Amino acid sequence: MLFRSIPVSFYEKDVNRLFNTVAVIDADGSNLGIYRKTHIPDDHYYQEKFYFVPGDTGFQVFDTAYGKIGVGICWDQWFPETARAMAVKGAELLFYPTAIGSEPILECDSMPHWRRAMQGHAAANLMPVIAANRIGTEEVVPCEENGGQRSALTFYGSSFITDQTGELVAEADRKTEQVILATFDLNEMQENRLSWGIFRDRRPECYGDICK
């Protein structure tokens, strides 16, 4: 028995296709299913389009022993549509396993922006967000495929948990592996979502332009 529910990221091969995938393992050890990453980045340091195809599962919500969770993967977290899609499917908590780091080409620290994007998802959907990011440095070794470039990407950790208003309630630092914890009353949060009326007052028939 695990006595906890865990999203587990892995690289999945399906015949001749590769996916960036997460499986959700429930407290009794059962596999509740998988989600395949929807948004695939293509950047100097995140060249996933060379390897992965876009996911075909659609956004998923998993009914775990401790509540209904939605899971997006890394680049998915920058799209508000990801969070809202999981929210309208009944998610009570949003999880984002992540591998993001310094932006040497842009010469900026994207960590605060990264956090604020997901704090906004929490506030807009009135549910906690849990983001787990890796630490450490990976070096790019010169080769023919990358034009002989040598570079390095330092992942900035800073994993965090927000409450349903987007306020940070737990956070890790940039350089060490840490376990962070928070406790939520799902019934209380559901009452809070209902009292705000955000989902009651949605007008999906007016949102067609964002799907173009």
Where in the sequence are the language-model features?
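CN hydrolase (nitrilase-like) catalytic-core segments centered on the catalytic cysteine
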Residues: 3-7, 68, 74-179
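Hydrophobic residues at beta-strand termini and immediately following loops
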Residues: 35, 62, 132, 172, ...
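Short beta-strand scaffold segments in enzyme catalytic cores
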Residues: 8, 21-24, 60, 159-161, ...
